[in-house]
Every structure is written in C-alpha cells, then in structure tokens.
Amino acid sequence: VLYFDFFPRQGKGGGAWCGYFREQRYRDGEREAPVVGIVANFTRPTATAPALLSLDETETLFHEFGHALHFLFHDVKYRGLSEVEGDFVELPSQIMENWATEPQVLAEYAVHYRTKEVIPEQLVRKIRNSALFNQGFATTELVAAALSDMDIHSIRRYEPFNPEAFEDNALRLQRGLIPQIEPRYRYPYFSHIFDGDY
C-alpha cells in the first residue's frame, strides 16, 4: 500500500520524504506487505488549474518514488534486516530521479494539462541543457555543507559554544560562501543523518 501526502499545510515539516507506516514483515509464515507514504510540499492546485509540478518538484516525486519502490518490493524474513548498505540507500531514488528528464519518459507524462499535447522535443532539449545551470554554486554549497558537518564532528573539547556563530564561521568565513545568499544547508537541515533509519 502506498499513500501520498503532497501538499503543504500548517504544522507539516518542509521538504519531501518517504517512510513506513508499517514495514514489510512475515507473520505466521505469510508475507505482510509494507504500508509506505510519500510526503511532500508540492505546489497546490488553484481554483482554475490543477497542481502543476515544477521540474524540481517532478524530480523530487521521482526520487521519493524510487525510495517507495525499494520499500514496497524488498522481501526480508527478519525485521530490522531490511536495510541495505549505507551507500546503496539512495541508489533506487537516484535512478528514478534521473529518469524524470529522459525524453522517452517525459513523452509519457509531460503533457499540456489543457491540450494534452506531449512536450515538444525542442523544450526537452532546453530542459536537459539547463540541468547544469548554476552547477558550480550548487556544488560549492554541498561541499561547504559536508565540510561544515565534518567541522562540528571534529570538535575535540566539549564546552559550551554558540552553534550559530560556529556555523556562520564554518560556512561563511572558512568556506567563502557569499553573505548575500543565505546557506541552504544549515545544521538543523541535517536531521535525516541522525533521525533517519539509515
């Protein structure tokens, strides 16, 4: 069983994720299928138009659906052994995410919501060419976040300190992120590292 919770509402966490309501298990020798949910904060429909996903939202949906497929189709005998090696966790989701902009896949789902016209090949080329736009800055952000995570896990003396000042020093002064752009990957963003079931 797969449930979807696509739209933002008050009190709902930001971002998107996939998780279990019930893990796959065996009971009395019979396999019980998992109950899985994909949660997101996609653009809501309006009074005059359906929910039209941006390219980023579409890739996110494909990504989380990759996790959902992994959860739905694994088959383990002992609970708690359903996990895979840490470096494999994101593979199914990355594969699905990358398929989102493949021309053959786009032709199946990317249609105009009024005319039902399939996305033109010229627009597909533009989408694929734009995928690398601003990649240098995106990579810098990710590297800065990774190095900052290493910084906080490399503290040798445990004494009270100001985490915001520590983070600002790590992200702006040491990594050179420009002050005009707020860092996307602040420490609270990393909740999945210690909160996830990896």
Predicted regions, residues:
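Cation-handling catalytic/transport regions enriched in His/Asp/Glu
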Residues: 1-198
